[in-house]
Amino acid sequence: MKNVARGLFGLLLGVSALLIAGCGGGDEEGTVEGVDADALLESAATRMDEVEAFHFILTQENGTTDILMGLELVSAEGDIAGADRAQLEVRAKLGSSNIEVGIVILPDGSYITNPLTGRWQEAEVSISSFFNPEIGVTALMRAVTDAKATRRVQVGGADTYLVEAVVDSGNLDLFAAGAAPGRELLARAWIGVDEPFVYRVEIEGAVIEGEAANTVRRLELSRFDEPVEISTPR
């Protein structure tokens, strides 16, 4: 993702615990025979650094994350295209209310829908205030320790290796701006067998001070380098 919004995003991800169907090729210690997890993670980081466009779904379970304008992120879905283009739909909480807002970021400006009227308005919005899949995924692949490939599973129709590892909470700006260091968290990454795209990342545990220990965040990526049009909203 070397040209995709470098410095544009800053991220957090969330989600429910996942039941995984299908596994194969593991030994008695729960690792996939013949797979070097560290080498696989480096291959994934290198490949993702080259991705120019992708679709993402970001979710969080057992809590929300502060993003911007008083909003608490519940989930987000959208597309990144090129160095400075993004569009997403955000489900969030504003006080006690559940709301949905749209965000569009373009080279010449950014826009957000008014939560009350639904109308688009110009705004100084940087995805770096809450979401960085572009830089964060690559950095995370290189920050984890004690990695092992535990299973071979299907994710969205793709054959992947599930890699489990440990990561310091301070390395998780991918999921939350201001991530506090000092906690060892369980990280999972689903990496393609045929080509090392990262299809899913999941983090268990508190990333920010005061979060619940059972917080789960998940980022799902797809449609790598597929054409997507992002234009000024009307």
Regions found by a protein language model. Give the residues of each.
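Sec-dependent bacterial lipoprotein signal peptides
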Residues: 1-21
